[in-house]
Amino acid sequence: MSPTPKNAVSPLDSGQTSPARHLSAESPPDLQEQFERLRERYQRCTTSLASAAHDLKTPLSIISGYVGVLQGEKLGALNDRQREVLGDMASSCKRLQNFIQDFLTYSVLETGEMQLRFEMGDLNESLAEVCSLWSPRFQEKGLALYFLANEKITPFPFDAPKVQRVISNLLDNACKFTPTGGTVWLHADPYMWDRRSTQPSSFPNDRRQRSLSAPNAIKVSVADTGPGIGPEFHLEVFDDFFRIPQKSSETDGTGLGLAIVRRFVSAFGGKVWVESDAGNGCKFSFLIPLAPSSPLDPSRGPKK
C-alpha cells in the first residue's frame, strides 16, 4: 500500500485546540466571562468523566476475574456452549476496560498531570512487545500483522510505556477497520526531520531524507489495507470524541484513541499525521525526536 503523500495532513500544523483553552487578554469582558463559564463547565465534565470511569474500573475487574476463573474450569468442566458464552463475556469485559482506560487517560491529559519519563531504551524491543500483545487479536480476526524491525535504530531516550500506548492505539484502530483477510504493517525508520516543513511526508525526496547519516528523529508508521479515510476527515480524525460516520455500527470505540495519540506525540515534542485516500488503506505516522525537547503540556492544543 502506498498512500498518496499529497493527502498527508498533520494536526499539529492545523491550529487545532481543545475547547475552552485559550482567549486573548484583549477580548471583551462579556466574552471573557462566557469563556470562563465554558472552561469551568468543561473541567467539570472532564472530572465527572474520570470519576465515573474510575468507579466502573473496580467492579469490572472483579467480573473479569470471575470470568477468567470460570474459563479456567476451576469451578467445574465446561461444555462448548458455556465456553462460547464466557468467551463473549471476556471480550465484552476487555472492550469496557479499554473504554475506561481511554477515559482515565484523557482525564489525566486534560488536567495536565501526565509526566514523561525519558530513559535510554531499544525502540525495536518496545515495538516488538506491543506486536506480541496484539498478535492474538489480529489472528482472531483473520488479519496479518507484520513488524519490520530496523537495525539502524540505536538506543535513545524515550518514554517507552507512552510510545507503546501510542502504537497500541494505532494498532487498535487498524484492527477495528481492516476487514478480515487484510494486512497491517508496523515499521520504524531513522528520519531527518525538517521542522520548518509543515508536511513531514511531503519532502521532495523522502527516501534521501531517511537515509541521511545524522537523523534527528525516528518515524514510526502503522499502515493497513482497510477502507481508508477521505481527505475531508484528515484533521478531524485526531479531534476529541470524533468518529468517522459509518454506514454500519460494527465498530465501537470512544472516539478518543487517536486524540490520545495526538496528545502523547505532542508531549514528546513530535508530530503525527495521516496519509490516506478513501478506499485505499490508511497510514498513520508519527515522529519521535532523538533528543527530547522540553515536554509540552499535553492538555494544551497545538500551536498555530
Q: Each predicted region: which residue ranges?
A:
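Helix-loop junction within the histidine kinase core
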Residues: 107-118
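Short conserved segment of the HATPase_c
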Residues: 211, 215, 229-241
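Conserved catalytic submotifs in the C-terminal HATPase_c
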Residues: 83, 117-122, 139, 144-154, ...
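Short helix-loop "hinge" at the ATP-lid/N-box region of the Bergerat-fold HATPase_c
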Residues: 174-175
